[in-house]
Amino acid sequence: VVSFPFEDIYIDRRHVLHTLPKREQKIVFYFALLTASLGIGGIRAIVCPLSAYNLEDCGPKELLSFFNWFYWLVNLNSAVVFVSISYIQQSVARNLGFLIPFVSGIMAIITIHMMRGEMIYKPKAESSLLTTFGVIGSALRTRCVRHRYLSAGVTNWLDHAKENHGGQYSEIQVESTKSLTRLFPLFTFQILYRTCVMQIPSGYYLQTMNSNLHFSGFVFPIAAMNVISIVPLLILVPVLECINSSCLFSSKDTGHSPTIYIVVGHLSAALSVMVAGFSEIHRKHFPQVEQTLSEEVLLVSSMPCFHLAPQYILLGVAEALVTPSCALLSFRLVPERIRGISMHFLALFNGAGCFMGAFFVQTAHAGTQGNWFPHLLHEGKLERFFFFLASLMMVNTLGFWTIAHRYNKLHEDYTSEFRGSLSGEKLLKHGKAVKHYDSVLESSPIFSPMK
């Protein structure tokens, strides 16, 4: 209830304003943002690898299908939340709008606690995040100290961390880290894409707030515009399932990689931001009218907010194409022991994109003295900011397209790339196979021992 200390939260039934100093309001506000970010970041990074444990032996087609429907369910829940809670906050009571997520969070914690035995069943893996950073640090340190003597027989700079090259980590740990670092270019190109997605709660939000929200006597909630970006994802997932079966994974040799989805999704995001720029120019051509929002009278454009729907739709199409494909590549292109770490890095770079979006907004506001990102949209040139971001996104798309071929080999077994020299692991797997074969012979009377 006190997460976001707006004034109407502190009005009781007698309409008496509860005095809370601005300093305390800021403390509560930033503390709430910190706890929310920690919770959301942890859930988004951990839940998906836990759910995908049952699919570790499946191929890329089944994995992409899983991630498609996983994010489909997530966005279906988001659509319900945006429609219901946003209406309650804007038209009924903002206090109740904050209380509902609080109660839902408590129920989710109780449910996870009750089901923890079913969710956490994987033994501790050999590789951890500290091991990954340790391999990178050891390689850099060894390379700097003994560069003259070790550079001749090393094909990759991370090989300096191997024990036979003067490092302190085994070959399996180093090779796992190498497979993870190959994904860093993929993660890096998602930063600017995530910056475009973050325009929904920033630039797109301001556009909607400064447009006509009245529709047949009903005030349309601003947050409900997010549903327009979710609807394309809910529609496209079943269509993409058919495309995946018929074209994308038709065969190991002639099929295409999901990187084509990422390229098309990045193009859709760039078009979305470009359309937002043209929509801003179009919005200014309408006369201004007064509109009451949260008990404040604002001068807004008389353009209906639904004219902004195309930019939301394009961004929804981008999310439907990019997010599941990136999750598939992050999960499939690394060995089993570090798949959770790979998903965590994907979430980390997505978070970096959110910070990049905030940085762009602050820089545009300060660098242009409020002209590119103004407080009052009719007095500034917000469209220039959108066109600048769209041009950056186009360059980002071309950059990813040039390296997309690196992530096409989804049918390779990345756990066997470096298994040839690991005799211990081979013997362990051979022992398991012998035990399984012996158990089959003992339990099946139709088999007779070979002489």
Regions found by a protein language model. Name each.
Residues V1-K451:
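Hydrophobic transmembrane alpha-helices of multi-pass solute transporters/permeases
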